[in-house]
Amino acid sequence: MLQRSVFFLSDRTGITAETLGHSLLTQFDGIEWKKHYASFLDSAAKVQEIIDRINTIAKQEGQPSLVFSTLLDPVILASVRQADCYLIDFFESCLGVLETALQQSPVRIPGRSHILGQDASYFRRIAAIQYALNSDDGSNSKILADADVILVGVSRSGKTPVCVYLALQYGVLAANYPFTPEDMGVVRLPSLLQPLREKLFGLTLSTSRLQAVRVERYPGSHYASFVECQRELQWQNELYQQFNIPFIDTTGVSIEEISASIINRMRLERRLYGT
């Protein structure tokens, strides 16, 4: 398999460069990426160190490295341009277009999107994360009614990580409720969920995937058997159909896609960054 080195450079956290860069790299198959990260490049010494590293690796591999950048300082950026690399700078390519459209020069302040408490977004995120943790697995029924969305599904179907992601990325108040064997039998909504039906969104997955997840945690148990996983999923999916609960099959789907689908289908408000 072809190998290529790729660098993610930033004068702050590097989250933007990493996220956008990874999204672009997924469009190219058959390449093993050797990833290098450098954040908080805020001095000439740090920048020179990473430039030397880029040049050394390029010489070793006999080809320029790829560099994804969100560097804002034009002097630092100019230095990186001299390295033996293909530079993809997200801010520089976008800021020029925005400057023309808005007829205003950018302030070029690194880390401005991460300034603590600069607006209500920070506090919304913290509150949403705290809510997701407090309401995990239906542990606090008194606050379920406060949810923007309540994820339902059998045990180990991935509800908790999706709730936390919805809170972290969108500021959504996401609770979750696990269907247990005690709920199963007659296909009906648990009494706690009946008045909250409009907030429910279901997660499902393949029997083999659910079994694999459960076996990791409880190997050899009845809980992790194929027959039990199949039985629980069949009951759950019949419930979704009977009560018209929207749901998504999460088998092989990323948490980002699952969350975006929930936001879209439930028409939830994005509470962060003014979106």
From Swiss-Prot:
ADP binds at G153, V154, S155, R156, S157, G158, K159, T160. GO terms for molecular function: ADP binding; ATP binding; phosphotransferase activity, phosphate group as acceptor; protein serine/threonine kinase activity. Transmembrane segments: none annotated. It is an enzyme of class 2 (transferase). Keywords: Kinase, Nucleotide-binding, Serine/threonine-protein kinase, Transferase. Its EC number is 2.7.11.33, 2.7.4.28. The keyword Kinase applies. It catalyses: [pyruvate, water dikinase] + ADP = [pyruvate, water dikinase]-phosphate + AMP + H(+); [pyruvate, water dikinase]-phosphate + phosphate + H(+) = [pyruvate, water dikinase] + diphosphate. PANTHER family: PYRUVATE, PHOSPHATE DIKINASE REGULATORY PROTEIN 1, CHLOROPLASTIC. NCBIfam families: PRK05339.1. Belongs to the pyruvate, phosphate/water dikinase regulatory protein family. PSRP subfamily. This is Putative phosphoenolpyruvate synthase regulatory protein.
